[in-house]
Amino acid sequence: MANAAKTIKVTLVKSTIGILPKHKDCVRGLGLRKINHTVEVEDTAAVRGMINKVNYLVKVEGE
């Protein structure tokens, strides 16, 4: 059986209006669209980097 990838839930809790374009790209890269939208993403270094860049906009569960 393949290794089950660890996942984390990320929720957008603040609007992306008026933020840096790079930060907006990170939010979209995580798959988030609207406020209170939650997605489940794989726990990888790339995803962690995107979350750290926009940590003031998101809430993370399942660390």
Curated annotation (Swiss-Prot):
Record-given protein name: Large ribosomal subunit protein uL30
The UniProt entry's GO biological process terms, in alphabetical order, are:
translation
Q: Quaternary state and partners of this protein?
A: Part of the 50S ribosomal subunit.
The entry's family comment says: Belongs to the universal ribosomal protein uL30 family.
State any GO CC term: cytosolic large ribosomal subunit
* InterPro entries referenced in this protein's UniProt entry, alphabetically: Ribo_uL30_ferredoxin-like_sf, Ribosomal_uL30_bac-type, Ribosomal_uL30_ferredoxin-like
Q: Which UniProt keywords are listed?
A: Ribonucleoprotein, Ribosomal protein
PANTHER family (UniProt xref): LARGE RIBOSOMAL SUBUNIT PROTEIN UL30M, MITOCHONDRIAL RIBOSOMAL PROTEIN L30
**Gene3D superfamilies given for it?**
Ribosomal protein L30, ferredoxin-like fold domain
Q: Which GO terms describe its molecular function?
A: structural constituent of ribosome
State if Ribosomal protein is listed as a keyword: yes
